[in-house]
Structure formats: structure tokens, C-alpha cells
Regions:
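FMN-binding flavodoxin-like domain, especially the glycine-rich phosphate-binding loop
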Residues: 13-33, 40-142
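Cytosolic transmitter module of two-component histidine kinases
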Residues: 2-4
């Protein structure tokens, strides 16, 4: 996740908790602002499902998340399932841009439930995050 004020981080913890309640094990979370991209890439190759969560920053993907996604493209990450969650109060655009970037990766799937958190987790987006957790859990548990 890429969080500016902590709200995207809170959404990441909320989603991880929902996944755990659904029986998903071995959940790993990383703050792209404080984790070297080499560790993120290593985990990307290890995992089958990756959730990209980013705040919108100047109508773009938060720079550290953008760096991570760029590295995935350069290293030809393939055959993964991605879930996308963006956060923004006025004009959340990070989700659309992350989707466009992931669509360039070979044999990768994007979950149908792309979610936007407007500032902070609340009733409506909490339900959307719970729906996303159900979709991810169903994919993982087959």
C-alpha cells in the first residue's frame, strides 16, 4: 500500500482483516514508502495474488507505488491476480492508472471489484472492501 495520511494504510489493514476472517492465510502487507522495492518484487514473484492500494497524488499514482509498478513491468511480472484499491477525496485517479499499468503485464488478471476509498474507510467503502475480500478469498481458495 501507499498511504499519505494513514487512511490507505487503515484500508489495507481492514482488507487484510476481512481476508483473515474468510480463512486466507499467509497475508503479507508492505508500505511501499518504507520497504525497498527489491523486497516488494521478491514478494511479488512469490505470491499469486497482489493487492495494489494507493492514494492519488497530484492526479497520479503515489510515486513509490508507481516505482514498484514500473519495476514489475521492467521485470516482466506475469501470471498474477491483482486487486486494485485507490484513495482520494476529490479526484481519485490512482486506481484507473494502476489498472492501465497492470493491463500491460502478461497473463495477469484484475479482480472485478475495484474499490475506491474516499478519504477514509466508512460504511459504503467498507462494504466494497468486504466484497473485494470475498472475491480474493474465492480466487485463492478455488
Amino acid at each position: 500500500y501507499a498511504s499519505i495520511y494513514g487512511n490507505t494504510e487503515n484500508a489495507a489493514y481492514y482488507l487484510a482483516n476481512e481476508l483473515s476472517k474468510l480463512g486466507v492465510k499467509d497475508i503479507a502487507m508492505y508500505d511501499v514508502s518504507s520497504t525497498d522495492v527489491s523486497y516488494l518484487i521478491s514478494e511479488t514473484f512469490r505470491c499469486s495474488h497482489i493487492v495494489l492500494m494507493s492514494a492519488t497524488y497530484n492526479l497520479e499514482i503515489y510515486p513509490k507505488m508507481d516505482d514498484y509498478i514500473s519495476d514489475m513491468k521492467r521485470l516482466n511480472v506475469s501470471s498474477k491476480t491483482f486487486a486494485i484499491v485507490d484513495n482520494g477525496t476529490w479526484a481519485p485517479t490512482a486506481g484507473k492508472k494502476m489498472r492501465e499499468a497492470v493491463e500491460t503485464l502478461k497473463s495477469c488478471k484484475i479482480c472485478e471489484n475495484t474499490t475506491t476509498v474516499k478519504s477514509a474507510v466508512n460504511g459504503s467503502n467498507a462494504a466494497a472492501l468486504a466484497d473485494l475480500a470475498k472475491e480474493i478469498a474465492a480466487e485463492i481458495q478455488g
